[in-house]
Design a protein with these regions (language model features):
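Membrane-interfacial helix-loop segments of redox and metal-homeostasis proteins
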Residues: 2-164
Length: 164
């Protein structure tokens, strides 16, 4: 991994995560709007009523709207990548190289469940939720392509790798 490659990847992670943050904030607003009895901009499109999705049981985790979790997830990716970008020479940002792909993977796993729920439980699609999921996958791709070896090295150091 070169400094230029890492620099480029971090910029992409920040750009993608910023767009995801805007989408997640909008989803949080829509969640509030739907909870207050309002509608969703896609409610007249067959199969694409985000209001139905945001009013479903799957739209909350322990009473917290999952859109808020998206805000936290994208903010975390932005903060970790910005910290690493500004302080590449500092040893303390080493952990950001572990936390970035880990955060992304958690987001992809959770987003996969939510996308499954849209398709097979709710039977409606929320276009803004799908955008958030695609952006999560894209940011995670850059995180893993740049720092995946760090996680592998961490497992190797701790003797977690299979012995052959």
């Amino acid at each position: 991994m070169s400094i230029e490659s890492e620099d480029k990847s971090l910029k992409w992670i920040m750009i993608i995560s910023f767009i995801g943050l805007i989408d997640a904030i909008y989803l949080s607003y829509l969640h509030h709007l739907v909870s207050a009895g309002g509608g969703c901009p896609t409610q007249d499109l067959p199969g694409l009523d985000c209001g139905v999705v945001l009013a479903s049981d799957q739209a909350k985790l322990f009473g917290i709207p999952v859109a808020w979790l998206g805000v936290v997830g994208f903010l975390t990716l932005i903060a970790l990548s910005l910290d690493r970008y500004l302080n590449m020479d500092l040893e303390r940002t080493y952990y950001n190289k572990i936390l970035l792909p880990t955060t992304g993977i958690i987001g992809v796993v959770f987003g996969s469940y939510l996308t499954y729920a849209e398709a097979f439980i709710i039977h409606e699609w929320c276009p803004f939720c799908v955008v958030a999921f695609v952006l999560t996958i894209a940011a995670t791709f850059f995180c893993i392509s740049e720092y995946g070896y760090e996680i592998k090295e961490l497992f190797n150091k701790n003797g977690i790798e299979k012995e052959t």
